[in-house]
Regions:
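Hydrophobic alpha-helical transmembrane segments
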Residues: 65-70, 93, 108-112, 129-133, ...
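Hydrophobic transmembrane alpha-helices
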Residues: 2-97
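Interfacial segments of multi-pass membrane proteins
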Residues: 99-104, 118-121
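Structural signal for the C-terminal ends of transmembrane alpha-helices
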Residues: 48-58, 101-103, 141-150
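Broad structural signal for hydrophobic residues in well-ordered alpha-helices, predominantly aliphatic
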Residues: 77, 97-98, 145, 177
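Interfacial aromatic-anchored transmembrane helix boundaries in multi-pass membrane proteins
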Residues: 76-92, 112-146
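Membrane-embedded alpha-helical hairpins and interfacial helices in multi-pass inner-membrane proteins
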Residues: 3-42, 128-130, 144-180
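Hydrophobic alpha-helical transmembrane segments of multipass integral membrane proteins
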Residues: 70, 74, 78, 98, ...
């Protein structure tokens, strides 16, 4: 399979992949699986691996990769800098900005990479894939909403109430994923 075919296939699987995590979580809850945490960790790791593979298979150019990496580094540095302040981390805001300006895949990558790199400072653990998934999802949804025009006005400026509402909702989304 060529990179182009793999990229198109994985692009078509993005939504089902992102929905696989809550669906498997609900199924494990209903079925009463005792090792649900391990099963969910495997599913999240698989989703992340496929998302990263899809991004790589899309063969992004340097002009697409560099802003993504710079924003991910900025988000990670901001998380480390504001570490002593509880519940104040700029990762969600930067992931939303990346998704809105660079596209949904780049928004996902910024959120996921920011969690991965900042945890080299805070410590890696079983929570790292969950943080990567949650912040990646925040950036991805920000990109989808921006592409749908949810943040745009007719005159081309940003509709701040909608952007702020999603920023608030993204904090709740992150908390639901992490605490579920």
């Amino acid at each position: 399979m060529t990179d182009h075919c793999a990229s198109r296939l994985l692009a078509k699987l993005e939504i089902p992949l992102l929905l696989a995590v809550p669906m498997v979580m609900a199924a494990a809850l209903v079925a009463g699986i005792e090792q649900a945490a391990l099963a969910m960790l495997v599913v999240v790791a698989l989703v992340l691996a496929l998302f990263f593979a899809g991004y790589e298979a899309s063969r992004p150019g340097l002009r697409q990769i560099m802003p993504t990496l710079v924003l991910a580094a900025l988000a990670a540095a901001g998380r480390i800098l504001f570490g002593p302040i509880p519940d104040f981390k700029p990762v969600s805001a930067i992931a939303i900005i990346a998704g809105a300006t660079l596209g949904r895949r780049n928004g996902f990558m910024v959120g996921a990479l920011a969690a991965l790199t900042s945890n080299f400072f805070f410590g890696q653990g079983m929570w790292t894939p969950w943080q990567m998934y949650a912040w990646g999802l925040v950036g991805y949804v920000g990109g989808v909403l921006a592409h749908a025009g949810a943040f745009d006005r007719v005159d081309g400026t940003v509709r701040m109430p909608a952007l702020l509402a999603y920023g608030f909702a993204s904090g709740l989304l992150y908390g639901i994923v992490i605490n579920a």
